[in-house]
């Protein structure tokens, strides 16, 4: 008997077939919907593949057809156009998400991959707190975090804006160095404005530094960018090997598929380095604010995008071959139209141009004509201490906290406002962009913290590291690609602890100037110095205390320099002066110490009576020739400066020890108002910190940065700023406090790798208007001011030409990690 033909009831392998009357009951041509005659699975089999980037059981083994986004056909692996989940859906292989964490000491790369490719993936505006709070809703990102290396957070550079930080990540440069100081700016030398929507954005004159795609190409590698600020600009005359012109409407999935296709290219064309960028969760965070259901959905979208990338890598057997860095440029903060500071509340007429928002700047509106003559100081003065609860502080760029590295560029307008969290500063009440969320604030704010996760054969597994700055990522990427980095602001080797086998081993800085000898000499005549000290009854005995024998000097160094003598990396004439309780490096060039170092215990015992003050008891140091010494007569009343002590005399419990500190080699020039801060810090805060931390090693000294470039001024530059006195006035003072992470240990017996540091770079100014402190008790403002001006030890080194921790018995990369640490003080919403 002849078998009857089974009726067709599916569109499988029939999509876009020619219409047939015989099959009119179950059609799969492109007009069947109009006739309402499609097979039941027409939508899933024929339509969905043109809209979906995923396989499903119905699609597995499908017949090839045009216009599909990706294929689930049997030959898709050969054709290299499979959907990324083809193997897990159609071949029942374990998905990357369900795989166990890989554990291998070596790269697992397929044939043809001699070196692990590197992918840099940015999720714009992904603040670190999102991952802490919503990790269970982001399984792919959470797995990457669990299996690879991640930081608690990565600190953005200031201002915490998109273009600024993306370009910092690929150059290792601060905004002031690479020139992209904001998403909007003016350059008086170019007489041009820069904006994200303007044509000038593609003018290479705006873009400084060497982005990593150029570093790679200059050293024989290939680089591809799927959207990245700067990648479509002809920087230094060239583009990346492959790049895409930005188009925000391009689906995230299309971006991932293209990056994966780059990895399918023949070796001769395949990029060694690729970037991938998506706008979420930033776009949604701006619209709805960081704490919103919409942001959670955008995070899940971002998570699926990562999952698609990892599935695609696994399908190519590259998931344990590729090194992947997943990061963000900045965080996100909630804003409200009820939290606006209007310039019209401070000025009768707002006769200037203002970049409004979370990181405002002010300049002349008539440029270039009035650019240089604009009275910035008058603007700052009118914006200072005007309201009891003012939600911003106005700074001249040169007075901003040094940790921001935001002064040394003509594009940085002189007037800058540091705005409180969740507030905006704007011109007037016409401002409308004040709902939802924004960013740009101080990079120490928790809400501005960004994510950093890394996975691949180059990175350690299941490792959490402490926070670091995004200027360090460029060097890290160069190490993964075995490249020599271009000059940058990062500290090369400080992220070695992220890597299984670090490529670069840092070398100790070479000292330029070893100390000279200052010999104990005859007592100079008091008439020469103008100094007096009537309370000293036996001057010879007091001076003889400064003539320590070698054994006493060694003991002083053990007590006061437990981590080694700071090395001097500039040409300088100085000598070490040993006292029982402190050591100083006295400079013959600037007539004051380069640094003083001492250690105080948890139970600092102060004298029952206050020691004599500098005004009534100060004498010349007999170890310093008179012509190389400060004198009391240098401090004339009309100079508004007073001698301040680097080592406080009242830190010595006995009278004779106090006289060891009442010498001209221990004094530095201070404005009287600054001395308020300095004295309160030493009398109240230092003992408190010493109690909390079981003792402290303290190193402090002057800084000279008159050209505010973040680096120490040469002595001939300093000489230009000495007026009516032979004493140069420091622009800042630094303090470096070192203790032990384990509070049962003291700074003197702390084991290697366990040190904890807290550093400050304090602007030396003649008033305390920054804190509105003229009539305020010191306890209400000093500590907050100091926290504002916290800094990395590395910042102190750059500004002083010193090299700290020279004798630590640990790998240098661990010391660099300590030097690049920036302490954070959690700021409440004001």
UniProtKB/Swiss-Prot annotation:
Signal peptide: none annotated. It catalyses: ADP + H2O = AMP + phosphate + H(+). A divalent metal cation 1 binds at residues 282, 286, 439. GO terms for molecular function: ADP phosphatase activity; metal ion binding; nucleic acid binding; nucleoside triphosphate diphosphatase activity; toxin activity. SMART domains: Endonuclease_NS, NUC, SO. Expressed by venom gland. Its EC number is 3.6.1.-. GO terms for biological process: nucleoside triphosphate catabolic process. Its main location: secreted. A motif (Cell attachment site) lies at residues 35-37. It is found in: Secreted. Its cofactor is a divalent metal cation. Hydrolyzes ADP with high activity. Shows weak or no activity on 5'-AMP, 5'-GMP, 3'-AMP, ATP, cAMP, and cGMP. Is devoid of monophosphatase and proteinase activities. Dose-dependently inhibits platelet aggregation induced by ADP and collagen. Belongs to the nucleotide pyrophosphatase/phosphodiesterase family. This is Venom phosphodiesterase. It comes from Naja atra. The lineage of its organism: Eukaryota, Metazoa, Chordata, Craniata, Vertebrata.
């Amino acid at each position: 008997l002849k078998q009857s033909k089974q009726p067709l009831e599916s569109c499988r392998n029939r999509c876009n077939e020619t219409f047939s009357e015989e099959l009119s009951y179950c059609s799969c041509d492109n007009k069947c919907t109009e006739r309402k005659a499609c097979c039941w699975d027409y939508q899933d089999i024929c339509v969905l593949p043109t809209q979906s980037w995923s396989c499903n059981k119905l699609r597995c083994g499908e017949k090839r057809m045009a216009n599909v986004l990706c294929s689930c056909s049997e030959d898709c692996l050969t054709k290299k156009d499979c959907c990324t989940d083809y193997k897990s859906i159609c071949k029942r292989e374990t998905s990357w998400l369900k795989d166990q964490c890989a554990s291998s000491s070596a790269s697992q790369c397929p044939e043809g991959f001699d070196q692990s490719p590197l992918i840099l993936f940015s999720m714009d505006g992904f603040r670190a707190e999102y991952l802490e709070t919503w990790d269970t809703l982001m399984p792919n990102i959470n797995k990457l975090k669990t299996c690879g290396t991640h930081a608690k957070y990565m600190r953005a550079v200031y201002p915490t804006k998109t273009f600024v930080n993306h370009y910092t990540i690929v150059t290792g440069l601060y905004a002031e160095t690479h020139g992209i100081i904001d998403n909007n700016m003016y350059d008086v030398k170019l007489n041009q404005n820069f904006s994200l929507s303007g044509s000038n954005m593609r003018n290479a004159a705006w873009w400084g530094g060497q982005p990593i795609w150029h570093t790679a190409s200059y050293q024989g590698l290939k680089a591809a960018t799927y959207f990245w600020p700067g990648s479509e600009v002809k920087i230094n005359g060239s583009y990346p090997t492959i790049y895409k012109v930005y188009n925000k409407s391009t689906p995230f999935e299309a971006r991932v598929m293209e990056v994966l296709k780059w990895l399918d290219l023949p070796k001769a064309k395949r990029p060694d380095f690729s970037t991938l960028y998506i706008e979420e969760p930033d776009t949604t965070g701006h619209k709805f604010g960081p704490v919103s259901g919409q942001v959670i959905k955008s995070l899940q979208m971002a998570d699926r995008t990562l999952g698609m990338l990892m599935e695609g890598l696994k399908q190519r057997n590259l998931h344990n071959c590729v090194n992947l860095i997943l990061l963000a440029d900045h965080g996100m903060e909630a804003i409200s139209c009820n939290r606006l500071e209007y310039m019209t509340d401070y000025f009768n007429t707002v006769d200037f141009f203002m970049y409004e928002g979370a990181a405002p700047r002010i300049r002349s509106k008539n440029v270039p004509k009035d650019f240089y003559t604009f009275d910035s100081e008058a603007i700052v003065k009118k914006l200072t201490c005007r309201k009891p609860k003012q939600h911003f502080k106005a700074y001249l760029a040169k007075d901003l906290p040094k940790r921001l590295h935001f002064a040394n560029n003509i594009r940085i307008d002189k007037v800058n406002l540091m705005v409180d969290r969740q507030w905006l500063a704007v011109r007037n009440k016409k401002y409308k962009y004040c709902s939802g969320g924004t960013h740009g604030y101080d990079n120490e704010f928790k809400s501005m913290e960004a994510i950093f996760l890394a996975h691949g054969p180059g990175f350690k597994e299941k490792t959490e590291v402490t926070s670091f700055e995004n200027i360090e990522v460029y060097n890290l990427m160069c190490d993964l690609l075995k490249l020599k980095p271009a000059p940058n602001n990062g500290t090369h080797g400080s992220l070695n602890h992220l890597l299984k086998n670090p490529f670069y081993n840092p070398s100790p800085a070479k000292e330029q100037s070893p100390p000279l000898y200052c010999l104990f000499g005859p007592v100079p005549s008091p008439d020469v110095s103008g100094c007096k000290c009537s309370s000293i009854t036996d001057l010879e005995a007091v001076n003889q205390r400064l003539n320590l024998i070698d054994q006493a000097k060694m003991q002083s160094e053990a007590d006061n320099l437990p981590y080694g003598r700071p090395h001097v990396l500039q040409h300088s004439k100085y000598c070490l002066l040993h006292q029982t309780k402190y050591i100083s490096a006295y400079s013959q060039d600037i007539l004051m110490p380069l640094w003083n170092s001492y250690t105080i215990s948890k139970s600092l015992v102060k004298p029952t009576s206050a020691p004599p003050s500098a005004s009534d008891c100060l004498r010349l140091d007999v170890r310093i020739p008179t012509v190389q010494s400060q004198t009391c007569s240098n401090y004339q009343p009309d100079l508004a400066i007073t001698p301040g002590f680097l080592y406080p005399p009242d830190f010595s419990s006995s009278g004779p020890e106090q006289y060891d500190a009442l010498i001209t080699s221990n004094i530095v020039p201070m404005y009287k108002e600054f001395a308020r801060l300095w004295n309160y810090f030493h009398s109240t805060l230092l003992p408190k910190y010493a109690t909390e931390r079981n003792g402290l090693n303290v190193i402090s000294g002057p800084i000279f940065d008159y050209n505010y470039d973040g680096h120490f001024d040469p002595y001939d530059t300093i000489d230009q700023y000495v007026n009516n006195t032979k004493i140069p006035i420091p622009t800042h003072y630094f303090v470096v406090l070192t203790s032990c992470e384990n509070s049962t240990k003291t700074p003197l017996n702390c084991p290697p790798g366990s040190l904890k540091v807290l550093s400050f770079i304090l602007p030396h100014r003649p008033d305390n208007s920054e804190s509105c402190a003229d009539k305020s008790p010191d306890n209400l403002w000093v500590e907050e001011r100091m926290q504002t001006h916290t800094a990395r030890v590395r910042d102190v080194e750059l500004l002083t030409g010193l090299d700290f921790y020279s004798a630590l018995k640990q790998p240098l990369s661990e010391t660099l990690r300590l030097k690049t640490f920036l302490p954070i003080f959690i700021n409440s919403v004001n």
